[in-house]
Amino acid sequence: MAHSTLSVVIPTHDTRELTLRCLGSLGHGGASPVDVVVVDDASSDGTAEAVRTDLPEVVVVETGRNVGFSRAVNLGVEQAAGDVILVLNSDTEVGEGALAALVAAFSDDETLGIAGAELMDPDGTPQWRAGRWPTGTWLFAQASGLGSILSRIPGRRIVGSGGAAVSGAVDWVSGAAMAVRREVWVNCGPLDESFRFYCQDLDLCYSARQAGWSVAVVPSFGVLHHHGATIANAPGASGAFHPAHLWTDLVRFAAKNQGPEKARCAAKALRAGARVRLAGRAMAGIFSSDRAAWMRDTAGYREGLTAVANVLKP
């Protein structure tokens, strides 16, 4: 089997130090990319200049204005030459031997179209990394915050430390560290730029699965992910995610790929979950030791509820 070549594309916005750490980690991956492309999405912290100074071999693309994750990735892939394109969040760090494991997976399995990483918190705790297509129950659990209680629901995300073998046993993998065979990118991509913040990964994986490709988490493709570091300070964020962006993009994914009835059901499940979360937060706020954080996060969830209520309106 021919040995696959690898390109790495890293979109970044105001994450200079994280981006440099991400780039530095590539040297431990066990396989040398044919090229590395950093797409600076209108950063104000000197990211592009720092990368050019510290790592002149890296290709730097500057968008000139904030165009969002999907557009930034698409611009980066235009500059990439590898048979396999690895899209990395700027808040990730590649583990020892991870790139070698990834390249081997694509070289050994011609049916593998998209591969995800064994994502981990800095302390080694497994993160959400892959799963089945979202169900109404899962959407309710996500919006309500009851996922840990309803951990055995259909459609749950896979978080086990072993991930999933390269067998096509998952429907989607996380875009935080997602590798795409070039043939899949050409025929099923690029990323849909109407998904500016979330669900680009689900959407591309859906197209790949429909075209007959397998999607899998690759064992030993370990990636540390500082989850939420790129969005935690954005207006409307609640901790490590942005409810309004995530929930509306989930509804848009359903509308695009599963039809209007599924989209309406998704919106109802998310609204119901959001109301449960807000009711719980109203009681928890009485005992909150960090009133400012409670108010910020609660405002984010309220914004999410309003956004979901309006997302399907003409």
What are these language model-derived features?
Residues 25, 40-49, 65:
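A conserved acidic beta->alpha catalytic loop
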Residues 25-33:
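Short, acidic, metal-binding catalytic loop of nucleotide-sugar glycosyltransferases
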Residues 163-166, 171-190, 194-222:
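A short, conserved alpha-helix in the catalytic core of glycosyltransferases
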Residues 93-130:
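Conserved donor NDP-sugar-binding/catalytic core segment of glycosyltransferases
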